[in-house]
């Protein structure tokens, strides 16, 4: 099946993006840190981006990539991309849902250790956009497939938060990237409480093995770690020492899981061998956008 399409409007022309090209770079990011803003046209199965306004653009969203983005590094090493496989592939589109309860907490899930992409990582529910899908259709499908959640009609609202350029492996020091995604984060604000939502969660054990809810204070501490301004163990005394989560048992039931704060504040390591359970860099960016939406 064909994938949903990502197109860039460059110098007035629509162009596709090859696998090894940095989306942020093509939009004029250069080597300076982001986020930047891009104008977007959102259609069924297609996303068009441009650094300048264009007819049909309906949104202007922040877009970001990690400082260690391998595709930004490849832009500086063009000879590498010519010798590696997968260069004839494009960039896949994904949608991730930041589900906010009426208590102002958001849902994160832990990917199973058997998944090919980003195993053991804490992320919001989400996945690939199919070629015939709208953005919200994709987000709600993934929320159902991963967490068994369907939201009652007229009891939620949605806000497009921003875009994240994602690679896996996430660093060139881990190896040449095998996956290249542009992820659109959608904030879904439910009128139901965390307790009401949690009572209906039934995670898919093939994709998810734990879930948790983060409040603004913990989210702010997590966000502060990615740019190196803090290190694990150095955080406000007002924060809890741990966060309560729910873990899937082998028999299909659930059990409480205590996550120490330093686990949530880990950053992306230099090598794959050092990688441990953590919150993904893209998720930290999404949490930052969520906090901005709350006025934090």
Curated annotation (Swiss-Prot):
Domain Nudix hydrolase per the UniProt entry, residue ranges: 90-236
Chain sites annotated for binding Mg(2+): 142, 146
Reactions the enzyme catalyzes: a 5'-end (N(7)-methyl 5'-triphosphoguanosine)-ribonucleoside in mRNA + H2O = N(7)-methyl-GDP + a 5'-end phospho-ribonucleoside in mRNA + 2 H(+)
Family statement drawn from the similarity comment of this UniProt entry: Belongs to the Nudix hydrolase family.
InterPro entries named in the record: NAD-cap_RNA_hydrolase_NudC (IPR050241), NUDIX_hydrolase-like_dom_sf (IPR015797), NUDIX_hydrolase_dom (IPR000086), Nudt17_dom (IPR033716)
Pfam families noted in UniProt: NUDIX (PF00293)
Enzyme type, top EC level: hydrolase
Function comment: Acts as a decapping enzyme capable of hydrolyzing monomethylated capped RNAs (in vitro). Hydrolyzes monomethylated capped RNA after alpha and beta phosphates to form N(7)-methyl-GDP. Shows low activity towards unmethylated capped RNA.
Keyword Metal-binding: yes
Co-factor requirement: Mg(2+); Mn(2+)
Superkingdom as given in the UniProt entry: Eukaryota
Gene: Nudt17
Keywords carried by this UniProt record: Hydrolase, Magnesium, Manganese, Metal-binding
Single GO MF descriptor: hydrolase activity
Protein name: m7GpppN-mRNA hydrolase NUDT17
EC number of this enzyme: 3.6.1.62
Residue numbers covered by motif Nudix box: 127-148
């Amino acid at each position: 099946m064909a994938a949903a399409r990502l197109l860039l409007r460059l110098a007035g022309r629509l162009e596709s993006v090859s696998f090894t090209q940095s989306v942020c770079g093509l939009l004029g990011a250069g080597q300076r840190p982001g986020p930047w803003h891009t104008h977007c046209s959102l259609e069924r199965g297609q996303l068009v981006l441009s650094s300048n306004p264009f007819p049909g653009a309906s949104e202007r969203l922040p877009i970001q990539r990690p400082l260690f983005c391998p595709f930004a590094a490849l832009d500086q090493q063009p000879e590498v991309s010519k010798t590696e496989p997968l260069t004839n592939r494009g960039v896949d589109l994904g949608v991730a849902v930041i589900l906010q309860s009426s208590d102002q907490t958001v849902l994160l899930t832990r990917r199973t250790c058997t998944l090919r992409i980003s195993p053991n990582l804490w992320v919001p529910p989400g996945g690939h956009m199919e070629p015939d899908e709208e953005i919200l259709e994709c987000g709600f499908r993934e929320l159902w497939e991963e967490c068994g959640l369907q939201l009652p009609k007229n009891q939620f609202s949605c806000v497009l938060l921003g875009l994240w350029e994602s690679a896996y492996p996430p660093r060139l020091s881990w190896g040449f990237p095998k996956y290249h995604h542009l992820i659109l984060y959608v904030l879904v604000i439910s009128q139901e409480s965390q307790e009401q939502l949690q009572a209906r969660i039934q995670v898919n054990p093939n994709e998810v093995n734990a879930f948790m809810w983060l409040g603004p204070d913990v989210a702010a501490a997590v966000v502060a770690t990615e740019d190196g301004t803090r290190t694990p163990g150095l955080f406000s005394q007002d924060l809890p020492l741990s966060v309560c989560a729910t873990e899937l048992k082998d028999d299909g039931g659930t059990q409480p899981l205590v996550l120490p704060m330093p686990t949530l504040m880990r950053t992306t390591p230099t090598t794959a061998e050092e990688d441990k359970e953590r919150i993904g860099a893209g998720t930290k960016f999404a949490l930052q956008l969520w906090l901005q939406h709350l006025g934090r």
